[in-house]
Amino acid sequence: MALPIVAIIGRPNVGKSTLVNRLAGEQTAIVHDEPGVTRDRTYMPAFWNGREFLVVDTGGLVFNDDTEFLPLIRQQAMTALAEACAAIFVVDGQTGPTSADQEIAEWMRQQRVPVLLAVNKCESPDQGLMQAAEFWELGLGEPYPISAIHGSGTGELLDELVNHIPAVEDIPETNEIKVAIVGRPNVGKSSLLNAFVGEERAIVSPISGTTRDAIDTVIERDGQTYRLIDTAGIRKKKHIEYGTEFFSINRAFKAIRRADVVLLVLDAVDGVTEQDQKLAGRIIEEGRACIIVVNKWDAVEKDSYTIYDYEKTLQSRLHFTEWAETIFVSALSGQRVEKILELVKTAAESHKRRVSTSVINEVLTDAVSWHSPPASRGGRQGKIYYGTQVSSQPPTIALFVNDSKRFNDNYRRYIERQFRQQLGFKGTPIILLWRSKKVRDAEIGNVNRATRVKLS
């Protein structure tokens, strides 16, 4: 059963995101002294007096301006309100009621959900009561004076809110796969998200950077739940100004860190850029599973060699992610978009997979019999005593050898390929830890001969 939803509504820069962060108990929505910082619907879990619910942060509502993406923001806010069981209308107690507040209040009175009026920026309790009293004229009932930044007054607001929230009992835990969607600005990340969801969930605009928060959306396919995290586009450092974009990029990096699988979205027209390479490096650094999604494939002129040539370019420019699955899609038309989730599920399973020590050593025995470890100039050969998986997410295998320095990069890559080919680790990095160990220590530490690597 889904959690009930509470929509946070208001004009720009009244403190909606600050209130969401207060209710959710963490800074997730981007807060900055700039109107219009929040553009998409951002869902965060909250809890009060035994009731669980989701608070939805929306963009600032402006009814009399159709420039840029303001009509899209209105659509997002309206969609959030349509799925909510209650709404909090946030106003600015320091400025008093405005014509924009009046317009929103008139619209809110026409909605089916109960509306609570939160008068924010009431930092002084005594003055706050007087500031809040001015908002009775909006016709939405009792105004609640609060300070979202300090937390004062929010308890009374929440006490009333939970009266309008249905209790959620026995919510089943979902075995969800967390998927971060990352890439440079304007490569089609939000369009891809919308193609998954089937609605305009994230704002899509040709204006670069229309997504600023890391936004969570939960979908289900064939009994599997996926949490999709759309993120702000990541640009080169020299193009980043301190402010909302700086915080957005930090959000994107955090999204990579908490994801099971990362979709690295590339622009088929632009090809692989230096920034794409750096993003891929960040994904590897965090040890995440990865799918390379080449978007806008419909915009590329093709012949029978196009996809082959593009794959060669990927192998050359992103050679360190050769283990990642690649798919060519069009988020705009939906071409092959659903196939992405199949690859995600496989990669997530590989990412958390554990393999028994006996199976690992069977693979090593075969690998050594096919290709012996290299020998040093003095004729001393490298020996692999045994291997064992020490962790997952990503799969990490410790290999105990006589001298790790005797195994060059080529042989190490060969062993990794053998694990992938024989154990099916698709879409996930594998970490091999080469540990030098004296012969006697290896024998003592590996009493079970069934797990010993047979050396030819």
Swiss-Prot record:
GO molecular function: ATP hydrolysis activity; GTP binding; ribosome binding
Binding of GTP 1, residues: 10-17, 57-61, 120-123
Residue span, EngA-type G domain: 4-169, 177-352
Disulfide-bond pairs as recorded: none
Entry keyword annotation includes Repeat: yes
A single GO BP: ribosome biogenesis
KH-like domain: residues covered: 353-438
Keyword Hydrolase: no
Alphabetized UniProt keyword annotations: GTP-binding, Nucleotide-binding, Repeat, Ribosome biogenesis
InterPro entries named in the record: AAA+_ATPase, G_ENGA, GTP-bd, GTPase_Der, KH_dom-like, KH_dom-like_a/b, P-loop_NTPase, Small_GTP-bd
Binding annotation for GTP 2: 183-190, 230-234, 295-298
Subunit-structure text: Associates with the 50S ribosomal subunit.
PANTHER family attached to this UniProt entry: GTPASE DER
Task performed by this protein: GTPase that plays an essential role in the late steps of ribosome biogenesis.
Family: Belongs to the TRAFAC class TrmE-Era-EngA-EngB-Septin-like GTPase superfamily. EngA (Der) GTPase family.
Protein's recorded name: GTPase Der
